[in-house]
Structure formats: structure tokens, C-alpha cells
């Protein structure tokens, strides 16, 4: 990752807000033409607040959007569940990037990791069935290597509804 922790947190907030905007407007061929940024003089706590705000707004949009809603994402049209999965993936992987930047580790709930991996990487190899779900998600995002598997593929996300 090339960003510092401040810019990584800003990216999380912008990504999550962008997903929320997609659900709100439901464009079919492009992203909503907007970018969210933290104020340049924001403290580290304030830029993390920006990221949390993006997550809460996305969660609200996911909860209030009907299941049939579809909106553009470069990896394919997504439903609310797909945007939720991609939002979790962004927050988890980049949250881990930030934690590592401070010499810490992130230890998310394994059930969340398992559900995110299954939802946005439905073609994940069966070799991952016995792998810790957090490690599998980090591997899928090319953050770590796993013994006996090729280097993490950094797969494109699959946001399309499960029936697609």
C-alpha cells in the first residue's frame, strides 16, 4: 500500500460514501460524479470519524434499499448486499493496513470474514475451506501468502447478485 494511514482512512470513507451514493441514485453506467475527502487539517481521530461516517451511511442505505435495487460498479452491477460486502472488504483490508502502519493487528470476527469472502469472491478455491477466514480474505486481497497456494490473486470483487 502506497498511502499513509491518514490517506488510507480517507480512502475508506470516500469508498463507503461512494457505495452509498450508488444505492441512493442507482446509476447504471458510471459512478455518481462526486468525491468525498476529509478536510486537510483533520486530525487522525477526525479522519477516522470520516471513515466511520461513510460506513454508517452505507449501512443505512443498505438497510433501506430494496433487494431489487441495482447500481453501477466497475466490476459489475451490484445489489445492496454486494455494496455491503464490498464496503466490509474495503473497511477490513484497509483497516488492517492502518493497524499494521501502527504496528498493531486487526482481529475481525471470523463469521464476518467468511461471509464477505463468500459474497464478493464466490469463485474462491475450495482450498480455502480449511483456512482461517480472515487469512483467506487477506490472501484474496493479495495482503499475505498462504502455504501451499500461489500468491494471493488480488481478485476483482464480484458485486453482482448471487443469482448472476
Segments from the language model and where they lie:
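Structured surface interface patches that mediate subunit assembly and partner/cofactor docking
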Residues: 1-4, 18-35, 39-42, 46-164
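Short acidic/histidine-centered micro-motifs embedded in hydrophobic/aromatic stretches
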Residues: 11
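Active-site HxH/HxHxD metal-binding segment of metal-dependent hydrolases
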Residues: 14
